[in-house]
Swiss-Prot record:
It is an enzyme of class 4 (lyase). This is Cyclic pyranopterin monophosphate synthase. PANTHER family: CYCLIC PYRANOPTERIN MONOPHOSPHATE SYNTHASE, MOLYBDOPTERIN COFACTOR SYNTHESIS PROTEIN A. Pfam families: MoaC. The gene is moaC. The active site is at 128. It comes from Cereibacter sphaeroides (strain ATCC 17025 / ATH 2.4.3). InterPro entries: MoaC, MoaC_bact/euk, MoaC_sf, MoCo_biosynth_MoaA/MoaC, Mopterin_CF_biosynth-C_dom. Belongs to the MoaC family. HAMAP family: MoaC_B. Substrate binds at residues 75-77, 113-114.
Amino acid sequence: MAGLSHFDEAGRAHMVDVSDKPVTARVALARGEVRMSAATLALVTEGRADKGDVLGVARLAGIMAAKRTADLIPLCHPLPITKVALDLTPDPGLPGIVVEATVRTGGQTGVEMEALTAVSVACLTIYDMVKAVEKGMEITGIRLLLKDGGKSGRFEATP
């Protein structure tokens, strides 16, 4: 399967051998949104959710998820993550919460999956913490915005 590095010549899945790759600085930025009603957003931003600090708990969940990515995604390498930061921004225009995760490492492979996992789990945590109020929330737009470092260089998503 040409172009798909996680498959061998016979089409069997395998973990890519990165042992000959140089250690370089890597960074990835991912983004997602949790869309909800204006009333639910107010509940979150005013700290009135029954389960507590929605944004604080979601931030911690995203950080924890980034560190556990190799346990969740079968062919991801365990990496020495040097930074995970999550920004959770209320956006009345959605209405909802915009979640962005930045992940850094000095390693032989990138941290795109860690950033995407952090965003995904933070969004799921927001949903979990307020689903009693609104089950129709929508998790949307999860995507990689930026990756830099390594052989393939820099990628920036188009707006």
